[in-house]
Amino acid sequence: MLASPPPMSAKTKSKPVSRAALAGEADPRLVALSVSIQDDGALYAEDIRGSQAHVTMLAEQGIVPKASARRIVAALDQVRAEFAAGKIRLDPALEDVHTHVERRLGELVGADAGYLHAGRSRNDQVALDERLFIVAACERCDAALGRLQRALVARAREHEKTILPGYTHLQRAQPVSLAHHLLAHVEAFARDRDRLADVRRRAAVSPLGSGALAGTTLPLDREATAKALGLAGVTQNSLDAVSDRDSAIELLFACALAAVHLSRVGEEIVLWTTKEFGFMTLADAFATGSSLMPQKKNPDVGELARGRAGRAIGDLVALLAIVKSLPLSYNRDMQEDKRPLIGGPDALVLTADAVGGAIETATFHADRMEEALGSGEALATDAAEYLVERGVPFREAHEAVGKAAAFSSAEGRPLAKLTADEWRRFHPAFQKDVLRCFDARKSLARRELTGAPGPRQVARQLARWEKALAKERR
């Protein structure tokens, strides 16, 4: 049997649905505390999309008249357009985006608007809105990280043969190619993208039909609604469905870790653009000046990438703290999840695109990078492995080269400039050909294990990434 809609008039100042059983109006201080439209207003498109799928299903199930459902769907299209155009005046008295949508719908279709909420609670409604938002946010973040990867791979291709010191503890350690270094960041962002795909998969189920916490007696077709929304299935426990914020937390974790990876790139931009390093010059479009010092060219893009990581971590911790120890099922605390959830993905996209633009347009100084290898310390490990190849235990070889490095430092001469006779003072297995260890290009050419910085390995990795990223664009 078709339900009759409750009376609704656009001219009547209606009491909020949540106060139907309460006397009088809410205290203004409670109203001010309860308002969330400044945060959840960003979910208007998801809220409308969910409502359209829900009312269409209600009509197919014979719960509401099909003509009324069609009018509601068409009117919701108009409401969406009005939100997008900024024509909906946000009223704190209406608290949230759901009430704003319903109020405007009532103005457009009158009493038919009362059909919309049949078989649905705010609890499963907002849970759906968030899931739809999370699915789309994962896709936006993934696309931004993909663009950044393409920028890194393109610059790596240009610098296959550029050599620089690799660092540990920010001290020169061993030589690597700039291509290998840039591809290291590509790998980190690939893991971020894998995490986002996992988050999307778990988020893409519909909680509609869970009601406030115990479902509904109405004959809903939950699977049909999920299919209409492009979701993979439905949640399996109504209590869990309305109290679950795992996908939001997982998304913010994925964003936070990606932001940490971006902060590492940002830190390198800051370091490499200093006069002390001189490895890199930012394009003027990605740098700023000083209000006082006219000579300054500041790497703000790198610094902001570092700073945004702190905000991303804070968003994650905030949401974890909000849901900590909450009893089943829904609690109003959860209203506070909107600000970190909605702002986090957008911040990641903005940062990734800015860092990608900086990488695309920067100048890398190959001569300065190779100059930083000149003293030979970065090839000391090769000298130790020279002894290992001649049967010397590694610890013994390590000690011998360490003593040679100390001697080199005391003499004020580069390690690469020691003579074969001087090397033999530290171990008899050193021969004249030990001097070949101090050619950085030959050193890299001997490092061809899978994942190593040898030229053939780097070429393989470049080809692999170029193929994978090109496939995404088709």
UniProtKB/Swiss-Prot annotation:
Reaction(s) the record says it catalyses: 2-(N(omega)-L-arginino)succinate = fumarate + L-arginine
Biological or metabolic pathway of the protein: Amino-acid biosynthesis; L-arginine biosynthesis; L-arginine from L-ornithine and carbamoyl phosphate: step 3/3
EC number per UniProt: 4.3.2.1
Keyword field contains Cytoplasm: yes
GO biological process entries: arginine biosynthetic process via ornithine; L-arginine biosynthetic process
Keywords: Amino-acid biosynthesis, Arginine biosynthesis, Cytoplasm, Lyase
InterPro entries, A to Z: Arg_succ_lyase_C, Argininosuccinate_lyase, Fumarase/histidase_N, Fumarate_lyase_CS, Fumarate_lyase_fam, Fumarate_lyase_N, L-Aspartase-like
Name assigned to this protein: Argininosuccinate lyase
